[in-house]
A protein has these predicted regions:
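Conserved P-loop NTPase motor module
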Residues: 1-18, 22, 85, 117-186
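Conserved P-loop NTPase motor cores
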Residues: 1-110, 141
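Electropositive, surface-exposed helix/loop patches at the edges of structured domains
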Residues: 95-116, 120-131
């Protein structure tokens, strides 16, 4: 994993150098990033890279579902993060975030105020140097239906496929129509 990731990062770095005079930014997005930062060599590599990448127009985005999965070795990297986008976090997750970014009581209160309503919306908080804001994401029903990966959600689509002879897309469209109806917009 380390060799593959370093190769990928080196390629992204080469693209940044090649296009450094372009006004187009490069986003380096790593999902499940706690897996990468658990390797002390990779964490140090990303710290060094991300300091240089700002000059090349490369922005490092790290995503994870669980802050407690980040090892202490990731502290230096996470302390450099300029923008934190936090979706519907719990009190225990706030403690984990506080390991890497000191939060004020007002910020903790704002984080705890973010809510989630299944199949409707998710609220979150943006924390940056010059901005703190509560936001709500209301995805279109089709996006929700296509993104449903829980076992019972997949079983619902499978049942529609079997019952009506639908393709997977047709089943997702049916689920989306049901979500629209439940939202009162159909």
């Amino acid at each position: 994993l380390a060799i593959s990731y370093i190769s990928l990062i080196n390629h992204i770095n080469s693209l940044g150098e090649k296009y450094q005079h372009s006004d187009r930014m490069i986003l380096n997005v790593t999902d499940e990033s706690h897996i990468i930062t658990a390797n002390p060599l990779l964490a140090k590599f990303l710290v060094k890279g991300s300091k240089m990448w700002r000059k090349l127009g490369i922005w490092l985005w790290l995503a994870t579902q669980n802050m407690d999965d980040f090892p202490n070795e990731a502290a230096k990297l996470l302390s450099m993060v300029e923008w934190w986008e936090l979706l519907n976090v719990s009190a225990s997750e706030i403690d984990e975030i506080n390991r890497f970014r000191k939060l004020s009581e007002a910020q903790k209160t704002m984080l705890l105020s973010a809510k989630k309503s299944d199949r409707k919306y998710t609220e979150g908080v943006v924390l940056a140097t010059n901005m703190e804001a509560l936001f709500r994401v209301v995805p279109p029903s089709l996006f929700l239906a296509l993104g449903m990966t829980e076992k019972h959600e997949k079983a619902e689509r499978r049942q529609l496929m079997m019952q009506h002879g639908y393709s997977e897309l047709d089943a997702a469209l049916e689920v989306a129509a049901r979500i629209d109806k439940a939202r009162g917009i159909a």
